[in-house]
């Protein structure tokens, strides 16, 4: 039943597992991290109390946190006043409820994102269907920014929650820009100038092109639309009550001119860069950090040529070389070395998750059916072409992170 205790618990666990840490200079977990008390709140460690300034137009935006096709989202208006507010934990709610006793949490909005206005071409399309309203970005507000800057200057940490409102995503809501809309970039720039360590929480269901003030922040977290208990999950991650485990299912361009940006590029294109920029994205498919360090070694593929009906069987050693536990997502990609038609340079074929305590290692087995290595040939037929392949295994789709091992598929029959 929606809204029941089991439903809320499931949402919390899904949110915890989906948060993606993209940058961390060591500021996270805050104050080195905490253990939880019986109520789930961070237990103080005897250190000095801290102040966390929670700022941004989405820090306490309950409805946008739910994402598209939720009640009152614009695509689903069956709940005119939105989901019940007391069922939703925003980032501000989560931090207020989970910081150690004695810590202070302050709040400033800092910026507005948008207002809505009637379409200047009229209220109806020629066929009589209603035209949706159009978005008008809000200009930076000096008073709101000044309030946020004052909060940041009076804090030990600033958590800036920015991104997209529900009017900027979903059916009929595509945007021409991938930048943060409204006064958000000016807000981040002003917060960065204070020198207070800034954690940027990006609440957006599509990849955005981020300003330097976000890319260079002390930490950057992509949370997508984490649902009703998302604010608690985010607070737990910031405080070290849970470990970061999410990985990007999309790529983030560094500049809008790089679009389309995706990991499984077709090989054979002429060159790998623009005159003024490489094709390397800001963040790639599969990226995601943890609070520890992990090493991959000794990728091994079972010897022997394979038939199209066989399975590639491989093993890799994964070791937690840091001081905190980790849930590591081991990603396996396949590259068909020579194809009869243009095809993706590599494609994700499998992944495995392994829990590792500090200092521990594990041998992770990866099985990839050869049938999953098919391409669509010049006749439009899906087929596994015999020849040489490469298995690539690592923590991300980025080439420099992947171990490689060859395997060969023999002709059928």
Predicted regions and their residues:
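Hydrophobic helix-and-loop "lid/oligomerization" segment in the mid-to-C-terminal part
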Residues: 3-4, 109, 113-215
């Amino acid at each position: 039943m929606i809204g029941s205790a089991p439903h809320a618990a499931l949402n919390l666990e899904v949110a915890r597992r989906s948060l993606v840490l993209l940058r961390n200079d060591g500021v996270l977990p805050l104050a080195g991290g905490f253990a939880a008390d019986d109520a789930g709140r961070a237990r103080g460690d005897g250190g000095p109390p801290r102040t966390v300034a929670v700022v941004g137009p989405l820090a306490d935006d309950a409805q946008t946190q739910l994402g598209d096709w939720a009640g009152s989202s614009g695509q689903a208006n069956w709940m005119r006043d939105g989901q019940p507010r007391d069922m939703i934990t925003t980032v501000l709610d989560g931090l207020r409820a989970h910081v150690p006793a004695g810590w202070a949490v302050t709040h400033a909005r800092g910026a507005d994102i948008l207002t809505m206005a009637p379409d200047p071409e009229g209220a109806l399309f020629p066929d009589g269907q209603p035209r949706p309203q159009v978005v008008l970005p809000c200009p930076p507000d000096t008073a709101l920014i000044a309030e946020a800057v004052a909060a940041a200057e009076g804090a030990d940490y600033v958590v800036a929650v920015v991104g997209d409102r529900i009017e900027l995503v979903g059916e009929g809501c595509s945007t021409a820009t991938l930048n943060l809309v409204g006064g958000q970039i000016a807000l981040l720039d002003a917060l960065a100038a204070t020198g207070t360590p800034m954690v940027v929480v990006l609440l957006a269901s599509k990849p955005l092109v981020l300003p330097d003030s976000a890319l260079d922040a002390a930490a950057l977290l992509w949370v997508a639309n984490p649902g009703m208990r998302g604010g608690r999950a985010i607070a737990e991650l910031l405080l070290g009550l849970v470990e970061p485990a999410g990985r990007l299912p999309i790529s983030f361009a560094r500049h809008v001119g790089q679009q389309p940006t995706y990991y499984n590029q077709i090989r054979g294109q002429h060159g790998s860069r623009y005159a003024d920029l490489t094709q390397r994205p800001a963040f790639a498919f599969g990226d995601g950090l943890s609070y520890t360090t992990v090493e991959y070694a000794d990728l091994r593929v079972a010897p022997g040529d394979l038939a199209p009906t066989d399975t590639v069987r491989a093993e890799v050693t994964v070791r937690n070389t840091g001081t905190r536990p980790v849930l590591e997502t081991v990603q396996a990609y396949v590259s068909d070395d020579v194809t009869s038609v243009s095809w993706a340079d590599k494609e994700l074929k499998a992944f495995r998750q392994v829990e590792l305590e500090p200092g521990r290692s594990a041998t992770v087995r990866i099985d990839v059916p050869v049938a999953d290595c098919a391409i669509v040939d010049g006749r439009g037929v899906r087929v596994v072409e015999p020849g040489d392949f490469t298995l690539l295994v690592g923590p991300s789709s980025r080439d420099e992170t992947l171990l490689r091992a060859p395997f060969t598929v023999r002709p059928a029959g």
